[in-house]
Structure formats: C-alpha cells, structure tokens
Amino acid sequence: MEASYDIMSRTEPGNDQIASPKERLKRCEIDADNVRYPYCMVWTPLPLISWILPMIGHTGICTSEGVIHDFGGPYYVAVDDMTFGNPTKYIPLQLDETNIDDWDRYVERGDKAYGQMMHNLCCNNCHSHCAYVLNQAKYKGNTGYTMIHIWWMFMIRSKYVGFSVSFIDHYQFIGIHQIIYWIHGHTYDSCFTILFN
C-alpha cells in the first residue's frame, strides 16, 4: 500500500471540511522504505561514536509529509538527506490542535535559525535544532526543551525502524567491545574489576 503524505489538505469522502488534527495524525503512516516519518523526530547512529557509546547519535525532525530536516554541520541544515544515513529510530510526536496546523512553519523556522549557526558537538547540535522546533511549537505546552530533553526522549520513547536495524545497532556495540577485549583482555578485565569492586 502506497502512503500519501498530502495530509494538510486531505478531506473525508463526502465531507467538505478539512479533517481534524487527530484524524490527520492517525492517517500519517511511517514509510521507512521511502524514508518518510510524518510528525516525528528521527535518530541515526554516528559512525564509531555510537558503536562505543550507543546512546549517542544524530537526530532530525520531520515535516507533516515526513521529510527529514537535520542540523548537519556549521551553517548547514540537511533536507531530505539525513547527514549520517537513514534513521534507525523514530519518535512519533503527539501534536494537538494548537501546533499541528503550523508544524511545517515551525520546522522551517528551526532550519532558518540553525542554518545561520555554528555547529558544536557539546552544546549547539542536532538535538538543539529539534528542541528549538519543539519550543517554537510549544509542544505539550512547554517551551523549555533542551538537547538533554531530546536525548532523554530518544532513550525512553523511541522505536526502531525494524528488527534488522535494531540488531545491527546492538551488534556494532557488542562487536567493538569484543574486539577491545580480544586486543587488551587483561587490561579490560582489570578496568571492570577496579570499577565494580
């Protein structure tokens, strides 16, 4: 079944009124094959960094049509081409009447603001870009989202795109640590003995 993402103008059959926000959100379908995640935040691993620390990754935020926007580097916001590859996790956002109609405008504001900013891994990054959009939209009545809030949301609320990417994400972490153990087994064991005794 092919999904249509023109939900802002979609109407019920025989009804001239635009569908309610809740109806529009229900009709939004995640289409991982075509990399479309309407009204979602998305996450992808950072090469090497996420293999060692799997809780660290790169985020983006999606329009009503599912197009990904991500702050990919200094003065650069990628659109429909996520900087570090296709998402492996996503969070469907729970929007309401107060912010769904202008959602794309909030994403555009975030792009405009972050397209003029220097990227910094520690304090002005892709997570900050997502937080900015949520603050503009007053997501869940809040305007105080930070990069830490976005990180935490991905830790507790994200869903994997599929089993295979879930397996690969975890396998990379286990594989890297297994290689470290093979190379420096005695040192690795000593570190854990010191830490946990």
Model-derived regions, located:
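Activation targets extended, charge/polar-rich intrinsically disordered C-terminal tails
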Residues: 2-12, 112-197
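Non-catalytic ligand/cofactor/substrate-binding and regulatory segments of enzyme domains
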Residues: 2-47, 53-124, 135
